[in-house]
């Protein structure tokens, strides 16, 4: 097949970028790489199109060259194309160099046995050193850009194979002295130097003259493949944190340098640092990272080499440079920073963080630096925050958190406030009016007050619990803070029991300093307030988490009172989970009486079976065996006794086990008929199920409770009828249905599973009015139209139309509700919305791109829902 045209390539590239994995799995994926390499030599394609093809190979080398042989062949072809370019200026030389380098590095083909590596490395080194390769390779005008590209390619190869350029250190150092402070060359030398120091230290060898050796003195070329093999662990050139101290002790500290090598190393580092101010801020930061890592822990190399850079950068406004400077502070400490330097830097960070015009990410960065400033680290016992050495309340007065701050900024400022609270008692003794601890208590009270708003946003509750966890973590050893925190959280639960899942999660993550008193407070709160029926499930969920052997009588009294209100399966299961928790806690006699009462009182057979099983276990097993029987079954060891195994299977058969959902439910096409809206559910069967019962719960109070749907049997591969779920809306609004399945498996086990929630759309509630007599349709509609006012409302909007026009849109979405039709430009539509609302539409004078719609309804809350529905009709198709 001949070369592809420009339009064909543009289409293929667009399809590939839309989904690379799908394209490569298709019929054209296998030939994409081969066609790309072939058409790079075609004279029919323009250079911009060839550059676009090379850009694709740079972005997706793993998809184009998935293994080492393919990468080797691709790099060879790219190098051949580079050599065959005419000597005139071309925009392809630099992308070809980058593409060949990327193919070898990403495909794992960079090794001494690779022919493409043997061709590419000398070419890159020749270009990097400025050696004249002849006018036949490239014109003089391209030599300088190609040299910079060669430096970048060598840095990429050194990053992939640390130690590869260890033999080129002397050459690169001499080249830096000759070429001046070129940014890619400086970064290349710094990376190669860092890698060589780390690898030689692990090998227990010195630098062995690597800093002074020239290219002519190297046997077998400048490529140190042995050093690269020893450095197979890929080192991050800009690591987010410094190596651990124990790594230094067995790493760079073991490097033995001769006096001459130490002198040459200092000269090389000084050479790089002295000209670093000419680099971009990002490049300067990376250079400081590399050199700081290389010299940290290296004996005989004082960090005073960085002092001129420190003086220069103390006033920097560049975040990357500030971050690198703080890394040097963490690495070298007092050996590099004086007390005056630390105070100045801390004051700069504090004042910068208070700037009112800072973007949120920058503000969070400054706060992060303050929180991780070495002199602000905790100095007390493990797990406790101690007084910071330099950070004081006067300095941080402008950084105190407020309820008006963004959540992330509030939490960061709160962490800073916790650092200051450890000195609270001392400053209170000196007569301070408003201590940090008092400010902290007021802030937490404000967060709890916002979280207690019934129906408030979930984000406010989440922020309150995040702040509570942060305070408990930072001030675990401060009872004066934890006691009011515990009391406040108990009051929050009293005001809004629906936050029970948040409380359970908090109890799972906090330490015992807050966990134990909070458990007691919440247990007392639940036991003393049975609550209304809608709050009962939250009380039971909370009690299942906090119940133990203490306060047995109050807990059992609460459960007896709650049992009368547990009428559905979900509440009964929640009640039994509390009983299970009490069983594991070792609660005795009173629980046995309660279980007997539940076995007689509960209406659901599953709940009765559970109550009887728990009573039998309590009556016949001692405490340790009872704990094992009620423990998780997944970690149970295999038992050799067939009798015991049979008993285990019998116990499992009596219990309802949670399992992955065996079916998938989706909402099918609706039919506007009947007295109530009916949701048609499509079923996809994954596993055979028997006696399936689907239970639906509406989130919120928008709908009346929904009945269960029963199906005797479902098997994969057999056609299934849609399941009909009648809806009883209390208000005409969309809803979200939580779905739970209870079923039997072919092996006889009873299981339950949670299915993904179902969404009831606004249009799923549409019902038609009774058909008026023939000839009376217009009068019927006008009577409905007039009856909506004055108690209702009306509006007008523009409904965009697709290319098929108004007639097709009405036929597809509104045909059952049309009362009067004058196609294709006018329709009168009447929709009945349960329980007792109506929505009337006049679609008249349709135009090519849309139709004006007049709406009337007797329920003003329907208006925004109707507007959203109409505006989305054209997009729905």
Curated annotation (Swiss-Prot):
GO terms for cellular component: AP-type membrane coat adaptor complex. PANTHER family: AP-5 COMPLEX SUBUNIT BETA-1 (PTHR34033:SF1). Signal peptide: none annotated. The lineage of its organism: Eukaryota, Metazoa, Chordata, Craniata, Vertebrata. Keywords: Protein transport, Transport. Probably part of the adaptor protein complex 5 (AP-5), a tetramer composed of AP5B1, AP5M1, AP5S1 and AP5Z1. Interacts with ZFYVE26 and SPG11. It comes from the Eukaryota. It holds the Pfam family AP5B1_N. GO terms for biological process: endosomal transport; protein transport. This is AP-5 complex subunit beta-1. As part of AP-5, a probable fifth adaptor protein complex, it may be involved in endosomal transport.
């Amino acid at each position: 097949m001949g070369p592809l045209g420009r339009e064909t390539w543009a289409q293929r590239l667009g399809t590939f970028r839309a989904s690379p994995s799908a394209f490569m799995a298709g019929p054209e994926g296998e030939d994409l790489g081969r066609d790309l390499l072939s058409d790079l030599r075609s004279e029919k394609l323009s250079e911009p199109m060839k550059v676009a093809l090379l850009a694709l190979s740079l972005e997706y080398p793993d998809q184009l060259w998935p293994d080492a042989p393919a990468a080797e062949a691709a790099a060879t072809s790219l190098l051949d194309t580079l050599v065959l370019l005419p000597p005139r200026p071309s925009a392809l030389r630099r992308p070809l160099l980058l593409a060949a380098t990327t193919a070898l590095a990403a495909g794992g083909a960079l090794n001494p046995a690779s022919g493409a590596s043997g061709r590419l490395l000398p070419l890159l080194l020749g270009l990097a050193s400025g050696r004249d390769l002849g006018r036949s390779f490239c014109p003089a005008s391209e030599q300088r850009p190609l040299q910079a590209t060669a430096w970048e390619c060598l840095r990429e190869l050194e990053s992939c194979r640390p130690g590869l350029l260890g033999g080129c250190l002397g050459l690169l150092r001499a080249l830096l002295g000759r070429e001046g402070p070129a940014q890619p060359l400086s970064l290349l030398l710094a990376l190669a130097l860092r890698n060589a120091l780390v690898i030689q230290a692990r090998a227990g060898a010195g630098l062995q003259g690597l800093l002074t050796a020239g290219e002519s003195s190297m046997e077998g070329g400048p490529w140190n493949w042995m050093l690269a093999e020893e450095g197979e662990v890929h080192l991050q050139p800009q690591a987010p944190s410094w190596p651990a101290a124990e790594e230094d002790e067995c790493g760079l500290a073991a490097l033995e340098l001769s006096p001459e090598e130490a002198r040459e190393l200092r000269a090389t580092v000084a050479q790089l640092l002295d000209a670093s101010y000419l680099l971009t801020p990002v490049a300067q930061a990376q250079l400081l990272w590399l050199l700081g890592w290389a010299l940290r822990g290296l004996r005989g190399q004082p960090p005073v080499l960085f002092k001129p850079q420190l003086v220069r950068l103390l006033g920097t406004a560049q975040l990357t440079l500030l971050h690198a400077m703080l890394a040097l502070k963490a690495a070298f400490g007092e050996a590099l920073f004086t007390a005056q330097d630390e105070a100045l830097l801390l004051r700069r960070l504090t004042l910068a963080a208070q700037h009112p015009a800072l973007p949120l990410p920058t503000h969070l960065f400054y706060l992060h630096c303050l929180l991780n400033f070495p002199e602000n680290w905790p100095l007390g016992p493990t797990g406790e925050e101690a007084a910071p050495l330099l950070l004081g309340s006067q300095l941080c007065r402008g950084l105190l958190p407020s309820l008006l701050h963004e959540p992330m900024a509030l939490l960061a400022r709160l962490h800073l406030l916790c650092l200051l609270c450890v000195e609270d008692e001392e400053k209170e003794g000196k007569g301070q009016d408003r201590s940090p601890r008092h400010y902290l208590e007021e802030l937490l009270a404000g967060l709890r007050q916002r979280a207690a708003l019934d129906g408030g946003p979930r984000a406010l509750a989440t922020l309150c619990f995040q702040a509570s966890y942060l305070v408990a973590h930072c001030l675990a050893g401060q009872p004066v803070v934890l006691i009011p925190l515990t009391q406040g959280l108990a009051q929050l639960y009293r005001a809004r029991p629906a936050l029970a899942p948040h409380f359970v999660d908090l109890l799972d993550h906090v330490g015992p300093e807050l966990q134990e008193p909070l458990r007691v407070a919440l247990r007392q709160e639940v036991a003393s307030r049975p609550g209304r029926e809608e709050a009962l499930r939250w009380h039971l969920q909370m009690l299942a988490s906090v119940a133990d052997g203490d306060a047995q009588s109050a807990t059992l009294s609460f459960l007896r009172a709650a049992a009368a209100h547990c009428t559905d399966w979900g509440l009964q299961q929640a009640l039994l989970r509390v009983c299970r928790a009490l069983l594991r806690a070792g609660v005795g006699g009173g629980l046995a009486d309660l279980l007997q009462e539940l076995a007689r009182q509960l209406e659901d057979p599953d709940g009765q079976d559970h109550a009887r099983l728990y009573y039998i276990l309590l009556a016949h097993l001692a405490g340790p065996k009872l704990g094992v029987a009620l423990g998780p079954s997944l970690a149970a060891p295999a038992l050799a006794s067939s009798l015991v195994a049979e008993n285990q299977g019998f116990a499992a058969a009596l219990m309802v086990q949670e399992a992955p959902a065996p079916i998938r439910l989706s909402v099918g096409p609706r039919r506007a008929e009947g007295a109530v809206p009916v949701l048609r559910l499509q079923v996809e069967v994954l596993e055979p199920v028997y006696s399936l019962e689907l239970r639906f719960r509406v989130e919120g109070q928008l709908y009346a409770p929904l009945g269960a749907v029963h199906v005797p049997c479902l098997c994969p591969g057999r056609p299934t009828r849609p399941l009909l779920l009648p809806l009883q809306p209390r208000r005409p609004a969309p809803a979200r249905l939580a779905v739970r399945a209870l079923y039997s498996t072919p092996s006889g086990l009873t299981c339950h599973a949670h299915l993904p929630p179902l969404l009831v759309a606004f249009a799923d509630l549409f019902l038609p009015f009774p058909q008026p007599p023939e000839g009376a349709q217009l009068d019927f509609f006008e009577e409905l139209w007039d009856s909506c006012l004055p108690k209702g409302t009306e509006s007008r909007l523009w409904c965009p139309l697709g290319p098929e026009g108004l007639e097709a849109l009405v036929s597809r979405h509104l045909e059952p509700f049309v009362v009067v039709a004058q196609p294709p430009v006018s329709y009168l539509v009447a929709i009945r919305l349960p329980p007792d609302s109506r929505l009337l539409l006049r679609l008249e004078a349709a135009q090519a791109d849309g139709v004006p719609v007049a709406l009337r309804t007797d329920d003003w809350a329907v208006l925004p829902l109707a507007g959203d529905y109409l505006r989305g009709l054209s997009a729905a198709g």
